[in-house]
Amino acid sequence: MALKTFKPYTKSTRATVVVDKSSLWKGSSYKPLTRGQNVTGGRNNAGRITSRHMGGGSKHKFRIIDFFRKKKDIIATVDRIEYDPNRTAYIALVTYTDNEKSYIICPQELKVGDKIQAGKNAEIKIGNSLELKDIPPGTSIHNVELIPGNGGKLARSAGSSITLSGYDGDYAILKLSSGETRKVNSACIGTIGVVSNPDQKNIKIGKAGRNRWRGKRPQTRGVAMNPVDHPHGGGEGKTSGGRSPVSPWGQSAKGLKTRRPQRSDKLIITRRKKRRR
């Protein structure tokens, strides 16, 4: 996929860069695997805001994705590749030899008409899904399970992938795109290839209205609020906050580790890279 720019008829079109989706399926989604979804606007059942800066946006129907690759040792044919408004990756509609259809995360270089398979008998080929112990080291994989039978959890967004580094007993050693190296049970399932739509990281929104279409509302700075609303609020004239950056509830917003200790910590070999701040 290529990037698409626009002639500068307006200030917003001058800045806008989007992904060219002209090669994707132009019809509607497959109805038996599609359902409606309610938009909460960031409110809970009491009507109170629990997630700020959410609301509005275009209506989307939810596509039911098979993260488990349940149909083992049955060959499937790729019918079409579609845009999914609920995720950055593209999805592929596949038909199995028993005429059952399902949506899967579409990897790069997967084309309409390709044959894919899941299970022990599958080849090491893009789109095929196998247990990690059956995949050779150095292979790029995506949609990887953390617990056997729980469905793919890792590397599902556009352009992401995991490198299978090797094995240590009953565990496979994975190098994640974040820089983290961790062990995962080698009976977990992963899919060969890199997730589609790698140009997603290069898009430019261009104007505030496009964020509103996506259901994102404006974000007010803490220093522009009153002291009753934010720790940085108040002051005479323009002030810089007077303290280290914090959230509206007083929690440090710069570098504080918020992940609680878990039993799975012992499986993490190397932590992810620190962001530059």
What are these regions (language model features)?
Residues M1-R87, V112-R277:
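Basic, glycine/proline-rich low-complexity segments that contact nucleic acids
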Residues N86, V94-Y96:
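Structural recognition of beta-strand segments within beta-rich domains
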Residues A89-A92, Y103-I105, N128-S129:
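Short, conserved acidic/polar surface loops in the N-terminal third of protein domains
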Residues A92-L93, A172:
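Short, hydrophobic/aromatic-rich beta-strand segments within well-structured domains
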Residues Y96, C106, G166:
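Conserved strand-loop elements at the edges of beta-sheets that form or border functional pockets
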Residues Y96-N99, S177-S178:
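Short acidic-glycine loop/turn motifs at beta-strand connectors
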Residues N99-K111:
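Beta-strand/loop nucleic-acid-binding surfaces
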